């Protein structure tokens, strides 16, 4: 795509876009609009950072049963999970920590419970997801804390009128039932309702007790329920508004350390509620959006024999208030943007091992710019955050792209980012340290993109230096959080997509060197090499999908059950294949089948925790 074409698309984007949080699909993947990169709508092809978009059609074609199964297919992502679906998981982008990933839901920061400060995406129902926008690289200058490795924006709004009912069955007693509908009330109001129920008997995620704990022969299953309700209203040609609320309740079983004579805490019960409302304004080249949001997450871990309210149980109870005002203005051959973010988090006593309730507030102000100057694209952003705990923090980033030949572009970028410590890391009587400072990073990336015949490709090389990393020091019960580590992460990444007749191909080749800058040890649970291949085609009314992933060897730790001392252990590399097929029985009814881990490979993503092995799924969907 030439500079002239996406300059025109960007110039038209402000007036063409009706809802910033939702994104927009088009038939041309390069021209589809994304909102996550710079917080204003722009064609995907005009964004200098690497961007991937997953639609609901992709999720249905791949027949993914959880968000981690979707994200593992995308470039730059490693996932470590303590077993199978709904077990605790970590998401690593380009070798950074799982706490270095900013997760948004409909453009609003996800409420994160837990002392690690990481988002556990295994708990978000896949039926809630209508679209995912995924940005690799630093984005703290746009969003503030957490966006060191990248940003994942989960969009929940159904994009088309109509109704869908789905039922599915699968291995390990898996059941899923969900439905959604979007209907017009008059000419200017749209109502959306969705619900989901899923269940699995599960399997024993630690069958042999080889994590150092005693063997606990049982099934580690889960049960989840979700409800989503929203309304959009167009007041006139300039103003529109929305209100939405959603919640989910999950219960999952896991294997935990057991001490004879004491309760066995091996059940997690997570309840999450979120309520958003907002108003959009658009007039000529100017657009503005104001959103207010409230969410509360309650995360219990307990022994079901004693109950959630026994003294052996733990509860992370966090409320989050968000207010964000976003503006963009068409200026010249590009856009300028800016806005204000305000957030308050409060905790109840007991959360993250806190003896008292605490509160943390953050106010951020930012500005962005994108301009086209002949064959050159320029991007920049700057942001300041005032945090009630650690004060003022400034981040910035800049990028430039030069289309030196029609269809080929050189890109260079540099940016700073940070991760603020959470309330548990600061105030916990067990692990806390009130002198903690934010983690900081500096990153650069050089890339070349091109369209060579049918092949649309990108080659990137990057380096990320992270300082003041937060980690525990000492052996339990005398361990504390400190700013003690540094990391240097280097990587090379090639992505390409092309079509050969009816076949659609997507390929990712990655080499990653993530190291502790002081000890030069490889960071845990990151693969140095990954190969990902997605093949989709249609034949005789059958839609086929084949997924291949090679994950190189990784390093993990095994802990002595008496001394808690850690020893390194190597996890072998693995090649995984998935096969999925769907068939439209009628114009309304589609049946789908999937085999996950086609060759029944035995592997681990976290040492000692089993993955499910080969699994079978069958689903039917009815649209009307």
From Swiss-Prot:
Subcellular location: Cell outer membrane
Keywords: Calcium, Cell outer membrane, Ion transport, Membrane, Metal-binding, Porin, Signal, TonB box, Transmembrane, Transmembrane beta strand, Transport
Binding site for cyanocob(III)alamin: 88, 90, 97, 115-116, 314, 525
Keyword Transport in record: yes
Domain TBDR beta-barrel: 160-624
Membrane topology listed for this record: Multi-pass membrane protein
GO biological process: monoatomic ion transport
InterPro entries the UniProt entry points to: B12_transptr_BtuB, Plug_dom, Plug_dom_sf, TonB-dep_rcpt-like, TonB-dep_rcpt_b-brl, TonB_rcpt_b-brl_sf, TonB_rcpt_CS
Signal peptide per UniProt: 1-21
Membrane-spanning intervals of the chain: 163-170, 174-183, 189-200, 222-232, 237-253, 268-282, 284-301, 314-330, 333-342, 358-374, 376-386, 390-405, 408-422, 440-449, 455-464, 481-498, 502-517, 525-537, 543-557, 568-582, 595-606, 612-624
Motif extent (TonB C-terminal box): 607-624
Residue ranges of the motif TonB box: 31-38
TBDR plug domain segment(s): 43-157
Family recorded in the similarity comment: Belongs to the TonB-dependent receptor family. BtuB (TC 1.B.14.3.1) subfamily.
Function: Involved in the active translocation of vitamin B12 (cyanocobalamin) across the outer membrane to the periplasmic space. It derives its energy for transport by interacting with the trans-periplasmic membrane protein TonB.
Protein name from the UniProt record: Vitamin B12 transporter BtuB
Lineage: Bacteria, Pseudomonadati, Pseudomonadota, Gammaproteobacteria, Enterobacterales
């Amino acid at each position: 795509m030439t500079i002239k074409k996406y300059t025109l698309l960007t110039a038209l984007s402000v007036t063409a876009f009706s809802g910033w949080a939702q994104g927009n699909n088009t038939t041309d993947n390069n021209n589809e609009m994304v909102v996550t990169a710079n917080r204003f709508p722009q064609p995907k092809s005009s964004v200098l950072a690497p961007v991937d978009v997953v639609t609901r059609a992709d999720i249905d074609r791949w027949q993914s049963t959880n968000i981690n199964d979707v994200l593992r297919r995308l470039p730059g992502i490693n996932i470590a999970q303590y077993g199978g679906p709904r077990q605790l998981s970590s998401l690593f982008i380009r070798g950074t920590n799982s706490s270095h990933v900013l997760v948004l839901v409909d453009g609003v920061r996800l409420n994160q419970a837990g002392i690690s400060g990481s988002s556990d995406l295994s708990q978000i129902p896949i039926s809630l997801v209508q679209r995912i926008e995924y940005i690799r690289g630093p984005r703290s200058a746009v969003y503030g804390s957490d966006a060191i490795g990248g940003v994942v924006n989960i969009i929940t709004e159904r994009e088309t009128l109509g109704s869908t009912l789905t039922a599915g069955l699968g291995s390990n007693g898996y059941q899923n039932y969900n439905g959604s509908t979007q209907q017009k009330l008059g000419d200017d109001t749209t109502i959306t309702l969705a619900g989901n129920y899923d269940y699995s008997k599960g399997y024993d995620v630690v069958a042999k007790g080889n994590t150092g704990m005693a063997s606990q022969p049982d099934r580690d299953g889960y049960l989840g329920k979700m409800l989503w309700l929203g309304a959009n209203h167009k007041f006139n040609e300039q103003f529109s508004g929305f209100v939405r609320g959603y919640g989910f309740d999950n219960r999952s079983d896991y294997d935990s350390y057991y001490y004879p004579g004491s309760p066995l805490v091996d059940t997690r019960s997570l309840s999450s509620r979120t309520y958003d409302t907002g108003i959009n304004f658009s007039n000529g080249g100017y657009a503005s959006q104001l959103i207010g949001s409230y969410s509360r997450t309650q995360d219990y871990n307990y022994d079901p024999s004693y109950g959630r309210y026994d003294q052996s149980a733990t509860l992370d109870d966090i409320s989050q208030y968000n207010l964000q005002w976003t503006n963009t203005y068409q200026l010249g051959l590009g856009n300028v943007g800016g806005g204000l973010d305000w957030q308050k988090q409060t905790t109840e006593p007991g959360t993250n091992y806190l003896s008292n309730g605490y509160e943390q507030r953050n106010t951020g102000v930012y500005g962005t710019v994108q301009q086209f100057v002949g064959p050159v694209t320029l991007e920049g952003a700057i942001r300041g955050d005032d945090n009630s705990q650690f004060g003022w923090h400034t981040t910035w980033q800049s990028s430039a792209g030069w289309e030196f030949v029609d269809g080929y572009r050189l890109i260079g970028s540099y940016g700073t980012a940070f991760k603020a410590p959470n309330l548990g890391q600061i105030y916990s009587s067990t692990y806390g340290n009130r002198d903690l400072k934010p983690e900081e990073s500096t990153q650069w990336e050089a890339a070349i993109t091109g369209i060579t015949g049918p092949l649309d490709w990108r080659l990137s090389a990057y380096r990320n230096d992270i300082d003041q990393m937060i980690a525990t020091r000492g052996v339990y019960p005398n361990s504390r959080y400190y700013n003690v580590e540094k990391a240097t992460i280097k990587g090379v990444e090639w992505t390409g997509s092309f079509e050969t007749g009816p076949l659609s191909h997507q390929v990712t080749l990655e080499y990653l060197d993530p190291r502790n800058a002081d000890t030069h040890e490889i960071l845990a649970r990151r693969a140095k090499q990954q190969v990902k291949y997605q093949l989709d085609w249609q034949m005789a009314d059958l839609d086929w999908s084949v997924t291949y992933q090679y994950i190189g060897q990784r390093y993990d730790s095994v802990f002595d059950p008496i001394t808690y001392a850690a020893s390194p252990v190597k996890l072998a590399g693995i090649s995984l294949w998935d096969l999925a097929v769907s068939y439209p029985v009628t114009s309304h009814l589609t049946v789908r089948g999937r085999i996950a881990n086609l060759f029944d490979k035995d592997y681990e993503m976290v040492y000692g925790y089993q993955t499910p092995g080969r699994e079978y799924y069958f689903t039917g969907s009815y649209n009307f």
